[in-house]
A protein has these predicted regions:
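Active-site rim/loop-helix segments in enzyme catalytic domains that contact anionic ligands
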Residues: 20-147, 169, 173-180, 184, ...
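Short acidic, glycine-rich surface-loop motifs adjacent to enzyme active sites
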Residues: 148-161
Length: 298
């Protein structure tokens, strides 16, 4: 009898849940989506774990620059902490996957993964590659680049080891290698039955200001974005949107409050076409490159 009532209760609850209407976009979100149709540019942000991504950069690119913006997390965070439950390992990876998907709903990005496993902390990329099948993870990154077709790739960490975690350094190393291989038909040719080769224009490192200052870099010559800008259409700054996104990483205790201020992020060119001040310099983000596209305006 108890089983009967339990099943009945489950059916009723599921019926109620699935009957809930989808959130209705407000007029500002609809207008933003229409404006976004005017642009074809895309950016792929790459790092190692859920919560590594700079949600302010993703928010700015997706809702400010109106570009198709993706985050490629090489792992699903199986080796992280869990401050809200008892799930660990694969179950924690499932939980953190959902947290990433919820974060993207708020900052406007798209989410991608590779088969890499978060097996815990490592000191170096060499140690990381002893556990990861480097060639398979690299093929996954190349696949995402060929399918997503980004104009620009941004890495969260440098490839030179200052990221504080072997996974972090490995993610940057693999991103730089994939940048070259994605346009090589000899690299992972089995993918070409489904996608075409693709050549992004540039790879940037989302550099840390203290690291640049330590090297006495001339910041005026490094492309930057003001992530604290206010979006009058949405009524929020991009850092406020970012806070809503980052707060979805509940298992990691990563809630944050939004602010409005000048918050500059700098982007160091790692590979690709040279640039002076604008990350998108020389890249046509309009429909002009598409046959008949000059007639398309929203």
């Amino acid at each position: 009898m108890k089983l009967k009532y339990s099943l009945l209760f489950t059916i009723i609850v599921c019926t109620i849940l699935f009957a809930q209407p989808k959130p209705t976009p407000n007029s500002s979100e609809i207008k933003l989506a229409l404006k976004k149709l005017d642009l074809l540019g895309s950016v792929l942000y790459i790092a190692a774990h859920p919560d590594d991504e700079n949600t302010a950069v993703i928010s700015y690119l997706a809702k400010g620059k109106l570009l198709r913006t993706g985050y490629l997390s090489l792992t699903r965070g199986d080796g992280g902490q869990n401050l809200i439950g008892t799930e660990q390992s694969e179950q924690l990876g499932v939980l953190r996957t959902q947290e990433l998907l919820e974060a993207r709903k708020r900052d406007g990005g798209e989410q991608f993964f590779t088969r890499a496993i978060d097996f815990g902390y490592t000191k170096s990329s060499e140690e990381t590659f002893e556990f990861w099948d480097k060639e398979k993870v690299l093929s996954d990154i190349v696949w995402v680049i060929r399918k997503f077709r980004p104009d620009i790739i941004i890495t969260r960490f440098p490839s030179t080891g200052e990221g504080g975690h072997g996974h972090h350094t490995a993610s940057a190393i693999l991103a730089l290698e994939a940048f070259d291989l994605a346009n090589d038909p000899k690299a992972f040719p089995e993918q070409l039955k489904y996608v075409n080769v693709w050549k992004p224009k540039r790879v940037f490192w989302n550099a840390w200001l203290p690291a640049l200052q330590k090297q006495q870099m001339d910041l005026s010559k490094i492309p930057s974005l003001n992530l604290g800008e206010f979006n009058s259409l949405l009524g929020k700054s991009y850092t406020e949107i970012s806070a809503l996104s980052r707060s979805m990483h509940k298992s990691q205790g990563f809630g944050s409050s939004g602010i409005r201020n000048t918050i500059l992020n700098y982007f160091m060119l790692q590979k690709g076409d040279s640039v002076v001040n604008d990350m998108f310099e020389g890249i046509d983000l309009s429909w002009n490159g598409v046959e008949g596209g000059d007639e398309i305006h929203t």
